[in-house]
Amino acid sequence: MHIIETQDLCHTYKGNIDALKNISFIAPRNTRIAIIGPNGAGKSTLFKHFNGVLKPTSGKVLIRGEPITKENIREVRRTVGLVFQNPDDQIFSPTVEQDVAFGPINMGLDEEAVKHRVSEALRTVGLSEYRTRVPHHLSGGEKKRVAIAGIIAMEPQVLVLDEPTAGLDPQGVREIIRFIRDFSVRYGMTVIFSTHNISLVAELAEYIYVMNNGSFVAEGTVAEIFSQPDLLSSVRLDLPILPKLISSLRSKGIAIDMGYTYQEAEIAFLKAFGKIA
């Protein structure tokens, strides 16, 4: 049984705008899944179905094998935590601590349990010293971390991140990469994220869905998807610079192993130049 599954999911907005068309998706437990595609592909709309923010026009969304209903919606939202692309859409409390505590309090936890979860969540995202800060005075990257802390304080089994690195500087991107790895490894959490940062996909994803015009047009491992540059071009995306360079060298007859992440590319170049066996 998958932690999240959709079956022929369709969503039509007012005006007969088909945002999702027959989406069938599975998220096994303890995996990292990227959903990539151009703006307007339907990624955000899909994510809002994962924890019941939106209801399907047709088709099914199953959480741990069960459809989302009025009776189980609270449990669904404890299971699936959604972080919006713009953190201002979900940060509203006067202090960082109060904002992160909002979810655990509404879960009915006692005061000590709430304090513990808030402390752990802030420590995990590196904001322990920000408890009394006003969230709306923080930088974009700091706000994003507050939003993530507010979700992980509820200890969901699935963390859904809509464009987690959008608007962040390089240091902020590196921090988000570290957090996502930490969540999935330390907590056994399933992480589903969308992004235009294809280098992020190479670093983090174990499986990829490619989306365009409300439909999935391809799916596969990083190697399977990144070996199809024409596919990426068709959805207005491009290979990360390192695998793009290696592909070019290989096409010119240079014997070099393929590499998709920085570490893989480094090893490939060292081998190609005889620096390591």
From Swiss-Prot:
The keyword Transmembrane helix does not apply. Its main location: membrane. Keywords: ATP-binding, Cell membrane, Membrane, Nucleotide-binding, Translocase, Transport. It is a peripheral membrane protein. The keyword Membrane applies. Its EC number is 7.-.-.-. Residues 4-238 form the ABC transporter domain. PROSITE patterns: ABC_TRANSPORTER_1, ABC_TRANSPORTER_2, CBIO. ATP binds at residues 37-44. It is found in: Cell membrane. GO terms for molecular function: ATP binding; ATP hydrolysis activity; ATPase-coupled transmembrane transporter activity. One of its GO terms (biological process) is cobalt ion transport. It holds the Pfam family ABC_tran. GO terms for cellular component: ATP-binding cassette (ABC) transporter complex. It comes from the Archaea. NCBIfam families: cbiO, PRK13652.1. Belongs to the ABC transporter superfamily. Energy-coupling factor EcfA family. ATP-binding (A) component of a common energy-coupling factor (ECF) ABC-transporter complex. Unlike classic ABC transporters this ECF transporter provides the energy necessary to transport a number of different substrates. Forms a stable energy-coupling factor (ECF) transporter complex composed of 2 membrane-embedded substrate-binding proteins (S component), 2 ATP-binding proteins (A component) and 2 transmembrane proteins (T component). This is Energy-coupling factor transporter ATP-binding protein EcfA1. It comes from Methanospirillum hungatei JF-1 (strain ATCC 27890 / DSM 864 / NBRC 100397 / JF-1). The gene is ecfA1.
